[in-house]
Amino acid sequence: MKVLGEASSYPYRSCIIVVFLSVSLFWLRPSTYHPQQQNLNPENVTRLESENETKTNYIIRFKQYKPAKDHRIYLESKVRSGGWGWIERINPATKYPTDFGVLWIEESGKEAVVGEIERLEMVKDVNVEFKYQRVLLGGSFPDGKKRPGKIFTSMSFEEGTESSPMADTSNTTLNWSRHLLAQKTQVTSMFGADHLWKKGYTGAKVKMAIFDTGIRADHPHFRKIKERTNWTNEDTLNDNLGHGTFVAGVIAGRNPECLGFASDTEIYAFRVFTDAQVSYTSWFLDAFNYAIATDMDVLNLSIGGPDYLDLPFVEKVWEITASNIIMVSAIGNDGPLYGTLNNPADQSDVIGVGGIDNDDHIASFSSRGMSTWELPHGYGRVKPDVVAYGRDIMGSKISTGCKSLSGTSVASPVVAGIVCLLVSVIPEARRKDLLNPASMKQALVEGAAKLSGPNMYEQGAGRVDLLESYEILKSYHPRASIFPSILDYNDCPYSWPFCRQPLYAGAMPIIFNTTILNGMGVIGYIESPPTWHPANEEGNLLSIHFKYPDVIWPWTGYLALHMQIKEEGAQFTGEIEGNVTVKVYSPPASGESGPRRSTCSLQLKLKVIPTPPRAKRILWDQFHSIKYPPGYIPRDSLDVRNDILDWHGDHLHTNFHIMYNMLRDAGYYIETLGSPLTCFDAQQYGTLLMVDLEDDYFPEEIEKLRDDVINTGLGLVVFAEWYNVDTMVKMRFFDDNTRSWWTPVTGGANIPALNNLLASFGIAFGDKILNGDFSIDGEQSRYASGTNIVRFPAGGFLHTFPLLDSSESGATQNLLLTEASKEDPAVLGLLEIGEGRVGVYGDSNCLDSSHMVTNCYWLLKKMLDFSSSNIKDPVLFSKFAKRYSPVIIDEKQLPSRRTDVNFSTYSSVIGKELICESDSRFEVWGTKGYNLHVRGRNRRLPGYHGIDLGRGLNFTVESKRPTRWRSAKEGGELSSSRSKSLGGLFNRDEIDMPFLVPTRWIVLAGVVASGVLVLLSIWRIRQKRGRRRRASGSNRLA
């Protein structure tokens, strides 16, 4: 019996060991924090997390300028909450009144403190203080990790160095011997500056503010360094990097080997960047205020970045120009990509400068337009304003001697030097009456030489012509004008993209967005609605709706033309010419009795054709695209490591411009819809093209699209992108600009939303991230971080390819690999349903010119031929690809929305009104759309919670407690309530985990299941032994 007792206790000991191992495996799992994935240096992790949990700096903007101590006393007397303090700023601006203060606020009570401050009568707003890091935008994300600081463009760079942006994407071919010769040519002589020098104009008595890295007081290249100020936290006025010195040399250097344009210009060096190229918003705001107080004439800022929603910075730039300071800024070094304009150069009141090489070609590094502020309902403005030489420009070294640098941050001081020279042309007594940001821009753009080849969104008005601008200023009288002043459909390629597609009746409005330059005053008004004056009878076929601001301030405004051909012009072929005039007036200047008035004119030369057949018309969905700013929208291709943001606009005329040209070459006509899908008439279009979309859909849109396809015969082509919760979790990082965690709002595309849209067609995408090369009928293509098709109806054609799935870790693959998962994933599907046809593909990188490896324009054309004209390519519609049974997946296995992020902040759908905006046909403006001509109502879809839209526009605020939870597979993290129910073992932030959440639970479940099996075995053994004892006892009794 003793031996039996020892043996029987063994299973119990085994059970205890199994349970112990189960708990240990979970508790000793890989750390949930991984510095590399959080994009922070290990030594900084603890400090940054600690700072994030304790104190955050906020900028408090006031409605009035007062001494800083008065603002501090006001806050201390009004704010009753604790946990905050005033931060003293010791700098040269201290002696002047200010309109802002900087506070530290403890994280634990920030909501109460910020709310109380925002309700104060004298407070304008409250914003998190930003930190700026001046680095190449493409280099802001080494190995896919964000560097500390706000994303900004690079300083200038030396050719051939690693810092040369886009070195492998240059679109310029240079003759090397000529290149070396040109390198020795003075940039001043290339613009003819010596002609003005001979007339005695050298920039005298012009106050030039250089916002950069400082300058040395005893530098021999400069005649008049009037003042040096330091706005950083470093105790030095000197330039230890060399960039500020170089910029000053281009503007005002006097060394014969690297002459500046205006050697007698008075230099005011504002050191706003540290030696590590770091700056803070408050430093800029103080320095800007000081520039205003000390009455600067010109200001050069050779920086820029994509965030045009940093309101304290943007609005302070407006205040700078409103104070009659002419600001010049670099347009950015993110070329040759389109849609990459940098702020503040993209503001209409700033002179934005692009770069050209010595052969008058647009430099490969120079950012291209259009501006993207206006999307999706409007259209971008023309930027840059002008271009200037920016490759191998000679300038001053840090202490003595000369060197050459390249970049738009070099082209910017070239123009700033020209501006200083032009300012000195006007007698000092008349300068403030004649010169201002608008009149100087008028002189530059009207005098510029248009280059042959580049379009208006690459070169603006063209190359700066110093002597022509000089002639304009000599006879200048205050007036208003429009830029560009002409839209000519015969002037291709300058008028691209307009000249690529004629107008026709029934199309969505063509929007042309112009800038009003008001040289008459800082404030102006439109006297009466703009007027269209056709040059001939045919001009009456054109219908124009105008949009313009109530007030033109500071110095600039906009005039947007929304143009349609009337229905009676459906068969017209020819040209329409005429002028649009707009009358502008400003208050009288000092000594004048009446307002200043001016009539601006915009010349139109438009081509019109008969309305194309339905099969040749494509509608592009712009409305459901979300970009940065304001949301953290991750890159589409995860292989691209130097750019983590999707910020190029995703527009036909930005990063999809090559695709647009291809479709036009193929005979298709493409129109843009910036409103919901209820706002177009499906009978007019062969195909709705939906590419790389991140937003959700109104229920009315889903219902209408189903009817449009099945009953109206609309074709539908969808190019999706990756969506994987675990990958999005890993892309989360702590941003020391905003002292907050950034997490992707969605994946490369919003797959859960697309699946809702496609559900009525029996189609759904999955959450795999697929990569690899494949070919169809000899056409090679690269699948770059695309998704898979997991649901597809019978009767359609579905194509699979052997692609690598990078969405699973090695551990997950080992555990979950089954026979079914070894099948090649489906990525391309074609389907006839009802009267319409649908084509879906899981990757859009092959259409996006920003980070394309190989294009798939050939595939897009085949899909459009099918969806619009029912032309079936024999390879795509091979019998081997036909599905005789549906591909089915359980609803619970489909990718689900993330409920731990405030998606409504960035969405045009969630919590918003369904309404057709001014980009849609005139007849449905302000309605819910076709057959729904009533005002829309706010809609909130299930699974989303509302938030305060007044703050947090530049980052994603994560919910501490997700509102609901479905499964680890669907959402990727546990609810906090569930965590607490397990004895506090799971109280860490699960969203930080680098190890896949489903994997961990499967491992744990496997171990626990093993333990349960052991217990069952023990129970069965005991049952058998019990029966044996009873049987033995019965036998003895017998």
Swiss-Prot record:
Q: Give the signal peptide as a residue range, or say none if absent.
A: 1-30
Q: What happens when the gene is disrupted?
A: Short root. Mutant plants have increased sensitivity to salt-induced osmotic stress.
Glycan-modified residues:
N44, N52, N171, N175, N230, N300, N513, N579, N902, N954
State the annotated membrane topology for this chain: Single-pass membrane protein
> What does the sequence similarity comment in the record state about its family?
Belongs to the peptidase S8 family.
* Summary of subunit composition and partner proteins: Interacts with PME1 and PME5.
Q: What is this protein called?
A: Subtilisin-like protease SBT6.1
Gene behind this protein: SBT6.1
